[in-house]
């Protein structure tokens, strides 16, 4: 959940990192983003710009930040979720197509706006670098949307202050709630190579 008081550029950076860590295949990757209407457009613009800057790590040894899917059938499942969302009216802001490069399947970070609860990407576990974004009117709506998921291993709250984030966290039905960061990814990012 990203509140109206959060800086949209800052929140976009965290949402991107938390959604694509380990190609979105980490158990605590953020799979759904709920952003306040007041900051939605600058947030979406920053998120899409950041996503377009992430490169596949192919060919090996030539840089890049994003690896392949670990299980080829997962690439097909994720592509089907993207296609379902687009067919039902989602807007594609970045990414969107799985590519076969060498022996692996890669997907650039995919940003979907205007997603709805009837889309597979919002109902199912994605396990890929897809960032579906729903805009909410007030924090009660955001909490209801977040808690409507069958999944709840991890959640995150980004706000203008730690106090605001901490007030929202106990209302979320999740095993772990990160405040001002994305689902414990700072631990992964700070780990030595």
Question: Residue spans of the language-model regions?
Answer:
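Conserved C-terminal structural/oligomerization subdomain of aldehyde/semialdehyde dehydrogenase
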Residues: 1, 6, 99, 106-193
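ALDH superfamily catalytic-core signature
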Residues: 1-116, 145, 179
């Amino acid at each position: 959940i990203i509140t109206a008081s959060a800086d949209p550029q800052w929140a976009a950076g965290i949402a991107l990192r938390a959604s694509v860590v380990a190609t979105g295949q980490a158990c605590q990757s953020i799979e759904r983003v709920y952003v306040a209407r007041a900051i939605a457009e600058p947030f979406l613009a920053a998120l899409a710009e950041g996503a377009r800057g992430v490169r596949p790590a192919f060919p090996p040894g030539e840089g890049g930040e994003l690896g392949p899917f670990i299980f080829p059938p997962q690439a097909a499942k994720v592509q089907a979720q993207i296609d379902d969302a687009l067919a039902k009216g989602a807007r594609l802001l970045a990414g969107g197509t799985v590519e076969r490069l060498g022996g692996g399947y890669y997907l650039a970070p995919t940003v979907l706006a205007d997603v709805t609860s009837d889309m597979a990407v919002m109902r199912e576990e994605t396990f890929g670098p897809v960032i579906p974004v729903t805009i909410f009117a007030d924090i009660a709506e955001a909490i209801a949307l977040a808690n409507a998921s069958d999944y709840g291993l991890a959640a995150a709250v980004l706000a203008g202050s730690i106090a605001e984030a901490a007030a929202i966290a106990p209302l979320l039905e999740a095993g772990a709630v990160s405040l001002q960061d994305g689902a414990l990814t700072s631990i992964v990012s700070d780990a030595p190579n």
